[in-house]
């Protein structure tokens, strides 16, 4: 969660401060988190007035883990809109004026998108295509579809995944993307002795990731396949080749997946594969293990002229027996 909070406070990403603006010129953020040990999940969608939506999602998960109340009320796992904002205040989470989340850069992007959309609508011979795809293209051109995601494993072998996003630029108010949807934005199952653990998060055009439930698809594949094959098949067959996206011309998506195959003592004496893949032009990844002196950063980029629309890369760690 701390990683997501850091990037939500960083105005160059599309999460928290600096998020894409809605048609109304406001910020509405989505976020979710999943704990691989308990398999609990917490999410918020179309949330206004909160600097760090992932903290609200984490609190939702925390309350869910407490179970039903004395009256038998089932705690929510997903809150949206004004209800999510009120719930956050009731639980002591920090709120802020909506204007605090808007930056000069996000305003300029919004103005550019509005002008282009109005120009497109007034054209006599406009090419018929999905309006959503137009918005996704505009977001990608402005390098502003930077969904924030994180996957991690602690020293006990417990895995967790989280994701946060401001959504596509010029989205309809109330629109919710994959970052808040179960199985689409993040997924995690914890490592047990002699078992496989997986944590996964996604990025890209939310509607497409929701239709394909990409986080769950890739994580499920990784339980029986190596991490590279899981991401290749997930993004290739289950995303680019999905029948649910057959009418979509430009399928924008990315996956970050952590796969752990352990010995008899969980996080001790295990192999950790960190793999990322994307169909977008680029994807930025940072990672660090306990034995590393400092984080490593990689800007993965599909070169111009590359015929394969999908790029998959990764790294491997071997955690010794303690």
Predicted regions and their residues:
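N-terminal nucleophile
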Residues: 1-322
